[in-house]
């Protein structure tokens, strides 16, 4: 069922360790016209980015993953791509937004579960907002 929203042309790096969620998110975004590069964890994402030669516009990553989590992945990616837009997703919203936050101030978090419409709308909002390199300064 196609969503009636503005179609995307950007490239998104999707990093999610749960195959069913990765497949769902990838399909929704591809149906909206985005180019989607998929990775199963942070280490896999770094390999994908190293091999991809075109511009990358957004990293959409799970927060908690084995090997290399979302925040550490984002820090590494922003070191080489400081204008990359970032969108986190997590089923652990209370933990991720707690007093001793796992995420940096101002980070956009999409809480699981989400609908296709919520996904597409949030992705578009993050892509349309100016990217920030503030994440590089987070200890």
Residue positions per predicted region:
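Disordered, acidic interdomain junction associated with two-component signaling
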Residues: 1-11, 100
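Acidic, metal-coordinating helix/loop segments flanking the phosphotransfer/catalytic sites
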Residues: 13, 26, 38-58
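Conserved acidic carboxylate
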Residues: 16
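Charged docking surfaces used in two-component/phosphorelay signaling
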Residues: 23-31
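Acidic catalytic/metal-coordinating carboxylates
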Residues: 41-44, 68-73
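Active-site residues of response regulator receiver
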Residues: 62
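Receiver (REC) domain active-site loop signature in two-component systems and cognate sites
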Residues: 65
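Alpha4 helix (beta4-alpha4-beta5 surface) of REC/receiver domains from two-component response regulators
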Residues: 72, 76-79, 83-111, 117-124
């Amino acid at each position: 069922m196609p969503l009636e929203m503005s179609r995307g042309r950007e490239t998104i790096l999707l990093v999610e360790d749960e195959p069913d969620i990765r497949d769902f998110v990838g399909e929704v975004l591809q149906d909206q016209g985005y180019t989607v590069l998929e990775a199963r964890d942070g280490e896999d994402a770094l390999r994908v980015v190293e091999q991809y030669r075109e511009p990358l516009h957004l990293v959409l990553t799970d927060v908690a993953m084995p090997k290399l989590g979302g925040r550490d992945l984002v820090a590494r990616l922003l070191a080489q791509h400081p204008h990359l837009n970032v969108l986190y997703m997590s089923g652990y919203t209370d933990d991720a937004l707690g007093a001793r936050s796992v995420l940096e101030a101002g980070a956009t978090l999409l809480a699981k579960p989400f609908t296709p419409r919520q996904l597409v709308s949030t992705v578009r909002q993050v892509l349309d907002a100016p990217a920030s390199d503030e994440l590089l300064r987070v200890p």
